[in-house]
């Protein structure tokens, strides 16, 4: 069950909207790439983020993995991001041995 739905570690997400949630499996790095229709943009909202700073972080990247990013985030309220193209990537990373904190990241594309 760990590899299904919003709790999966990474992957390409093509649905119009959805949610990315805490991955609690053994991997320490997860990268999700959200792809909207060509000409559309991707919007991401993180209502509440409270990770263990220094041990884990979320990174929002404007485009495909490795694109310019908005910095490493470990806490915040009401965070929103918008891509400049039809792709946006989200990376979650934690140090080995540290249990993942819970988080929910919501995304949608403009149509």
Swiss-Prot record:
The keyword Disulfide bond applies. Residues 9-110 form the CUB domain. Gene3D superfamilies: Spermadhesin, CUB domain. The modification N-acetylalanine is found at residue 1. SUPFAM superfamilies: Spermadhesin, CUB domain (SSF49854). GO terms for cellular component: extracellular region. This is Carbohydrate-binding protein AQN-1. The lineage of its organism: Eukaryota, Metazoa, Chordata, Craniata, Vertebrata.
């Amino acid at each position: 069950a760990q590899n299904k739905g919003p709790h999966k570690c990474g992957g390409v997400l093509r649905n119009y909207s959805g949610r990315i949630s805490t991955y609690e499996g053994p991997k320490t790095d997860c990268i999700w790439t959200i792809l909207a229709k060509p000409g559309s943009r991707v919007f991401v909202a993180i209502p509440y983020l409270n990770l263990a700073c220094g041990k884990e972080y979320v990174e929002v990247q404007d485009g495909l993995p490795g694109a310019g990013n908005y910095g490493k985030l470990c806490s915040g309220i009401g965070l929103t991001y918008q891509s400049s193209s039809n792709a946006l990537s989200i990376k979650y990373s934690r140090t080995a041995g540290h249990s993942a904190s819970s988080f929910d990241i919501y995304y949608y594309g403009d149509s």
